[in-house]
């Protein structure tokens, strides 16, 4: 390679994909032998011995996981020391239930991580040793002291909940995802630190695991009666609602893959997701914030505690902020510095994040507070103490995101595609070998793709890919050209034994999309995904691989308990604009192609709107009414839910119609109903 890092694509592809080399980002074996997967003679028998049972780690997986011990210093116990430091109290076992006894959060499910007399259990063959170590540290739960006056309850949900002692009560940071979990955490604090009221709440950013448990510690009535400040970054409310509504159904289904919702915890199942032990499944709530922070340097004094806020929009969330506590010399880093490589793109789906901005905000935090800070702490994982330690922590974390952003841009400017770059970039040893820069949540590979997407979008400029065939149609033509499917499977079986799991997964999944009833293809694809999962260092990658394997073997488990139902509180926070946008999303344009309506919406508690439906499209104007409207609907803002939910009883109670009496029926008869349990690894 020359000094300007110019890459010959053909050499790169041949060297990377054909070797079956260990991919450092996921510690997974990948490769291909595309030339060996051609057509075979008609009538070849299917490979024997394929079953729907989970398999042990294969030889190549064993080798990949064993190589991790040579890569990382497992004698370095500093992160474990930080994770255990300051423990005040913890129950012997932790399982949190809702009002009807359903388990919504369990650390008992991960008891297999515990060793005798507190000694850690060694990693099994079916787990990447680095991820196993992370899971053991995230399995720690209880009440911890950060400094005198700042306390965290960790391991009671995916997120940490933080309690800052004021003169009369607690200022709470990020009240978890579920009310049941935050209530249990607050009870633990009260038991060991005394009874004190909540006197303020800071929610660092609008992801549900950082605000959904708010009603477990306060009520709306309490907030109003005691004027409790609910402090958030500007833009919090809009993003909190929009992210969970517009693409909520698809995000919810995909989140099941990311978080391992359908998997049992265990050595062959789900472990840590890198920033916690998965998502709780309790009651999600929302209370509208009442104090917005708009600019870095703004301060608030709540219950005698002075806080200075550092705005970091476009990092881990579109609206996010760090907090500096000068009297404690403590720096709260929200979810911007979490002891692992985070996501520039999240597998459940979301807008991509800006790696360059993320790095710059971390360096800005260091410049503003690094000279004085004695501890950094955040919403996931554990604090880091010591001025030298935390400054190095901030710099190394910033360097990860900056490296990925810069190197992706360097290679894309040489013409490499997103997928090529993802297989090429690897963190330098100075970054890769630190325990807090490991790829437990995000990976270099999919973060590089996020950078490519941010700057270049989905298109790689190859016109062959400009309007590619849908996967099912393409797969059928591939299968037709390949010929005898059993001959393809026989060759795939050979490649499986050689450890080319990614290629085997790709070619067998092609056969599945061509014919979903091809059971040998399904089972071999599942086996390949399973081995990729066993070797993955990223918790979400492991979950995705193992969930795909599970669904190929047994189909989609459509048990309603797995369905992401959303939060009524979040839905009630929707503005009229959001509701009307969502009406347009729900409208089946083909079915409503001939529908032509103009409707006045006379909200009793909001500005009026004119709603136009034309050519299958919903358009609206705020602050207007049409003289020639087909009808006028008088309703409260929340009455729109009667339309969106097609609830005729609620419509009759909440909506007054003047004009066309059938207008509500016309608006709702072509609204789509979403199937939550849609297929992912098969057509």
Model regions: which residues?
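Active-site metal-binding motif and surrounding structural segment of the metallo-beta-lactamase
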Residues: 168-169, 180-231
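Divalent-metal (often Zn2+) His-rich catalytic cores of metallo-beta-lactamase-fold enzymes
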Residues: 49, 53-63, 340, 356-420, ...
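N-terminal pre-domain segments of enzymes
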Residues: 43-134
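Conserved beta-strand hairpin/beta-sheet module of binuclear metal-dependent hydrolase folds
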Residues: 136-196, 321-325, 329-335
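Feature captures hydrophobic
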Residues: 36-38, 43-46, 491-494, 500-506, ...
